[in-house]
């Protein structure tokens, strides 16, 4: 996770249905999807784009769960 960087708050207000659907999407996107969708030539502070995408997805899942949207 991005412990060495300043975090950027991203305020987002969603209707309940969109938040539920987004949490389902976040649950279903896997590491293999990040591998397939990322560039192998892009790096962020020495980390591959795939790994940064995967980390961001985990942060999104945690934020959704904290807001009460944690699909099984």
Task: Tell me what each language-model feature is.
Residues 1-16, 20-72:
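Positively charged, low-complexity terminal tracts
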């Amino acid at each position: 996770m991005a412990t060495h960087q300043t975090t950027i708050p991203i305020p987002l207000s969603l209707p309940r249905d969109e938040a539920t659907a987004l949490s389902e999407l976040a649950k279903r996107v896997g590491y293999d999807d990040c591998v397939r969708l990322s560039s192998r030539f892009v790096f962020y502070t020495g980390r591959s784009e795939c790994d940064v995408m995967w980390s961001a997805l985990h942060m999104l899942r945690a934020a959704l769960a904290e807001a009460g949207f944690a699909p099984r």
